[in-house]
Amino acid sequence: MAKKNGTSWFTAVKKILWSPSKDSDKKTHHHKETDIKRKEKKGWIFRKTKLETTNSVLQHTVRTVEAEEKEKPPVIVSSVEEGVTEIVKLTATPGFIRRHWAAIIIQTAFRGYLSRRALRALKGIVKLQALVRGNNVRNQAKLTLRCIKALVRVQDQVLNHHQQQRSRVLLSPPSRNYNIEARRNSMFAESNGFWDTKTYLQDIRSRRSLSRDMNRCNNEFYSEETELILQKKLEIAIKREKAQALALSNQIRSRSSRNQSAGDDRELLERTQWLDRWMATKQWDDTITNSTNVRDPIKTLEAVTTHHHQRSYPATPPSCRASRSVMVRSASPRIPCSPSSMQPNYMSATESAKAKARTQSTPRRRPMTAKKRLCYAEEESLRSPSFKSCLWGDHESDYSCCYGDGFAGKISPCSTTELRWLK
């Protein structure tokens, strides 16, 4: 009790002996330590502090520095002391330690967040790659299955073909018949004398004969197919040649018909042109007129023309043909029909009748082409009484024209427009 309440004599002696400066230094240091402890208790600390370790490290560094100071010169010692004091100041403060641990915690949390985000992105990429690769793998699997099916079908067809060939060979006549199973047994039989020279040679010969027979069967089968194909090709070629021949014959016929029609048109045009020239050069005589006055109401005028039977036109102009005989006869037997007979004046036609005959004989015409003239040859020949007869053909002809009037006009020279080719 005395120790706690009152001061002992030992403490009093210490106070007397010790200096006040040392006591003040100790007190200040003690106050600092107590302040640090209070602050540590009030603050929030997530993890345990390592003050003891830091203090031990600092003590160790101080000891090493002191040992080195003894060995080094004074200049180096002063610089080292300054560095050590700075390090001690930085590390000794409790705020620096807290900040250091807080930065570490923040960095760990942020790095964890980044790593999780990267992991999620990688998982999404992996899933997409798996989907794409899965589709590609499925497509490849489908293609491989199709190829395998096609190969299996081909193999089945080949096997069926070989079986059919073998059946044909077996059903062939006995000269070609051979025992396949016996030869196979001889090929694969295990006997002691198989490797003898005679048996070995016989086996080789049998194999050669079998291969020859199989080749013959194959060649016969393919030869039949080739013959059928060649026959079909020949039939197609014959049909094509027939069609070409028919087309050529039709073309030749159409061309010949066109040439004939063009030739006829040309001949007609040449004839009309030649007549125009000849009519222009010919000097007609209007004096050759024979007027008759007959008591009968009906009179006939017959113009008889005679020509040589020739198919070609003469090279010289037909001036000789102009001297054809034109005879006027009356139907009554009273009047003699002689070219030299003279008629009295009272029987001659009057001028009014002549003018009327002229208007009837030469109607007003429009210019027409040779083709239209030929088309309307018969109608216009009946209408125009002026041109009674004309023949430039190959044979003789006689034309007669009937008049209801009681006079006969004079025959005027015809023009090419009044010419009608009668066939």
From Swiss-Prot:
Pfam families: DUF4005 (PF13178), IQ (PF00612). Keywords: Calmodulin-binding, Cell membrane, Coiled coil, Cytoplasm, Cytoskeleton, Membrane, Repeat. Residues 231-251 form a coiled coil. Residues 99-127, 128-150 form the IQ domain. GO terms for molecular function: calmodulin binding. Disruption phenotype: No visible phenotype. It is found in: Cytoplasm, Cytoskeleton; Cell membrane. It comes from the Eukaryota. GO terms for cellular component: cytoplasm; cytoskeleton; plasma membrane. Residues 235-252 are annotated as: Calmodulin-binding. The keyword Transcription does not apply. PANTHER family: IQ-DOMAIN 5-RELATED, PROTEIN IQ-DOMAIN 16. May be involved in cooperative interactions with calmodulins or calmodulin-like proteins. Recruits calmodulin proteins to microtubules, thus being a potential scaffold in cellular signaling and trafficking. Regulates cell shape and elongation in aerial organs (i.e. cotyledons, leaves, and hypocotyls) probably by regulating cortical microtubules (MT) arrays orientation. May associate with nucleic acids and regulate gene expression at the transcriptional or post-transcriptional level. This is Protein IQ-DOMAIN 16. The lineage of its organism: Eukaryota, Viridiplantae, Streptophyta, Embryophyta, Tracheophyta. The gene is IQD16.
